[in-house]
Structure formats: C-alpha cells, structure tokens
A protein has these predicted regions:
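Bacterial N-terminal signal peptides that target proteins for export
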Residues: 1-11
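Bacterial N-terminal signal peptides
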Residues: 10-19
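Short, cysteine/histidine-rich loop/knuckle motifs that typically chelate Zn2+
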Residues: 155
C-alpha cells in the first residue's frame, strides 16, 4: 500500500512540475509578448492537421466526382471552402500557384512571406513557416507544397503533365493566430 501511495504521489508531483514548467513557459511568453514554444508547436500541429484534411478532401473529391473537364474542379471547390473558412474567422488559407502558370490569376504569391516560401518549395522544402504579428497578435504563417498526385489533375492543368514526380506545382498558404 505504501509503495502504491508513494508512486501515486511521485506521479502527481511530476505532473505538477511538468505543468508548472509549461505554465512558466506560457507566463514568460505573456511578459515578452512573444508566443511560447508550446503555443507555436500547438499551432504548427494544427497546420499539419488542416493540411492533411484539405489535401485529402481534394484528392477524394477528384477521385469520386471529377470525371471529365465539364465537372466542377476540386481545386475550385477547395478555394470556395477556403473562402468560407476565412469568412467565418477560423484562419487564413489560400491556394497558391507554384508552376508559374496559374489556373486563376488570384492564385499567386502576394506578399513577401508567400513569395519566399514559393521559392523554398520550388527548391524542394516540404514546409515553410514564420512567426509574425497580425492584428496585434502572434500568428504562424506556413506554406506546404501540392504535387501532382493524380492523372486527373492534367484535365484542368495540361502543363502539369510535364511536372517532375513529387515536384510542387501549387501550395497552400496558412495564417493561424497562435493562442
């Protein structure tokens, strides 16, 4: 009984210390105005999850609903979804052309972060991020590549037929408040 109680107390003490270190990290970040490492990591993890969800949705929509060039393109569906997400205040998300031949002129890198991130993605990076201030709050800007993953992509983007396997032809640009 004593051993079990001792282990339980030790576990509670360790949990308390761990929580204390996390709270200290959060508290020190509040004093400096900079986000804590833990907050940045949580936001980074959210970007990765959103990236997986959005890309999986586009592939599934393309696979199940895009059969010829008269069907509504999955990329256009993604852009509509991104607009709704941003309009509702969840986060900023944009589809960006990396190929140099955008399907829509709006889908080009617009600011310094996006232009630099596109260069890095073209050079083979698989993720680019930067912590910035947006509307007086810390935010994580991130960009991930979109390679051609299906033959159906060339129905709307015939120039993708020449893309090297795995090369970025597009990207998703994210802006999330760090909380």
């Amino acid at each position: 009984m004593y051993r079990a109680t001792s282990l339980l107390v030790s576990g509670v003490v360790l949990a308390g210390l761990s929580a204390g270190f996390l709270l200290a990290d959060e508290a020190s970040s509040e004093k400096t105005g900079k986000p804590s490492k833990a907050a940045i990591e949580r936001t980074r993890k959210t970007v990765r999850m959103l990236d997986d969800v959005y890309k999986t949705a586009v592939v599934l929509i393309t696979d199940k609903y895009v059969h010829d060039e008269n069907d509504f393109p999955a990329g256009s569906a993604a852009i509509a979804l991104f607009g709704e997400v941003e309009k509702k205040g969840w986060h900023g998300v944009r589809l960006i052309d990396v190929s140099g031949q955008p399907y829509d002129p709006e889908n080009v890198a617009k600011d310094d972060f996006e232009k630099d991130a596109v260069r890095q993605l073209r050079d083979g990076k698989d993720y680019v991020e930067k912590v910035v201030e947006k509307d007086g709050k810390p935010a994580l800007r991130a960009m991930t590549p979109i390679p051609v993953v299906m033959q159906k992509c060339v129905m709307c983007h015939p120039h993708y037929a020449d893309a090297k396997k795995g090369a970025a032809v597009g990207a998703i640009s994210y802006t999330l408040t760090i909380e």
